[in-house]
């Protein structure tokens, strides 16, 4: 339907509603007041039109309950890429400072194999861990950096191991495979100093997607695999979407939602590559022989489907793949140092890495 026609239909509906309007019906203010009936239905195409009352569950912490109970606007004002990046950089700095107050560390900006990196060294790094390193591939939608600090500082502190956060090239200026190439270059350079069994690669959101892509690329190149992978809120399939992308926004059941359309995920990142390319979408590749991998997601995560589908593909390929799903929380919630669940998630991640590194 074109814009003019949609506008005319909207006006017609508006006039019709005004002519027939009665006194407004009070909306329920609590789950207990909501009608005890289900108005969901399945249309002729098989799509579900869902109406549900979902209370804030008692299974999560009080701070998490407050977060879930806070509504976010359905409409997001247009934002330039430059504004998004500056806003994300400001958020990353604030959140990183908050984590640093809890987890003292030293952060150094450097380059490895010509790629910018942030090296996060935890306070009190033991001598026994100086021959080990964790590689973080940050989130941020492939077009900004929302996690090089929030994903590195707590993990470095809890694992007591240095983290190298890779500041890979961003889309749309540098589409796939630029981020993969940068990450592989850093890994290859670190192999000159560290044994592969003393290296872990991990990431959250787009960084988790990138982690799976890098693992696929390492296998393709015949390079030695790291000791473990951490894939936290991800997808491994740019050609298809699961349920969660239609159900949840970044903020779960609140906030702006862009249901998936017929086009592939993130065309600015994909560029002209086939969405089923086995490095871009590792779910279509040969996953046999990949290292032990931890998957983490949550039940209101927009990438819940992507995470569990990739986890199942790893299992089917014989990979030692573990999955942790947190109840009710939203996409990549572990960035927030105020949530007890964030502390729990980061400890689970760090403990998994430490055990795979032989400590």
Q: Where would I find each of the regions flagged by the language model?
A:
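Bacterial N-terminal signal peptides that target proteins for export
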Residues: 1-10
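Sequence-pattern detector for short linear motifs
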Residues: 9, 55, 87-88
């Amino acid at each position: 339907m074109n814009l003019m026609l949609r506008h005319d239909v909207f006006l017609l509906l508006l006039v019709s509603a005004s002519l027939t309007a009665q006194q407004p019906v009070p909306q329920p203010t609590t789950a207990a007041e909501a009608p005890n009936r289900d108005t969901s239905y399945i249309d002729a195409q098989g799509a579900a039109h869902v109406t549900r009352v979902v209370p804030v569950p008692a299974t999560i912490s009080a701070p998490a309950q407050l977060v879930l109970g806070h509504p976010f606007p359905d409409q997001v004002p247009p934002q330039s890429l430059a504004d998004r990046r500056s806003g994300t950089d400001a958020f990353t700095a604030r959140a990183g400072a908050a984590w640093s107050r809890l987890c003292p560390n030293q952060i150094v900006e450097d380059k490895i194999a010509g790629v910018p990196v942030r090296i996060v060294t935890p306070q009190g790094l033991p001598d026994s861990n100086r021959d080990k390193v964790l590689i973080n591939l940050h989130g941020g939608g492939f077009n900004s950096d929302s996690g090089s600090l929030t994903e590195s500082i707590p993990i470095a502190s809890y694992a007591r191991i240095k983290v190298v956060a890779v500041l890979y090239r961003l889309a749309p200026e540098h589409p796939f495979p630029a981020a993969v190439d940068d990450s592989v270059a850093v890994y290859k350079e670190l192999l000159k100093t560290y044994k592969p069994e003393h290296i872990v690669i991990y990431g959250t959101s787009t960084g988790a997607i990138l982690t799976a892509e890098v693992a696929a690329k390492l296998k393709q190149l015949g390079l030695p695999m790291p000791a473990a992978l951490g894939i936290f809120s991800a997808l491994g399939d740019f050609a298809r979407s699961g349920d969660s992308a239609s159900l949840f926004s970044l903020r779960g059941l609140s906030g702006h939602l862009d249901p998936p359309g017929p086009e592939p995920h993130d065309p600015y990142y994909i560029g002209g590559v086939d969405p089923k390319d086995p490095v871009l979408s590792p779910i279509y590749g040969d996953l046999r022989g990949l290292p032990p991998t931890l998957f983490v997601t949550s039940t209101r995560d927009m990438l819940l489907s992507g995470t569990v589908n990739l986890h199942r593909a790893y299992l089917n390929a014989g990979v030692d793949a573990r999955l942790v799903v947190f109840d009710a929380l939203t996409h990549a919630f572990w960035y927030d140092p105020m949530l007890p669940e964030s502390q729990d998630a980061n400890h689970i991640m760090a403990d998994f890495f430490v055990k795979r590194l032989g400590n």
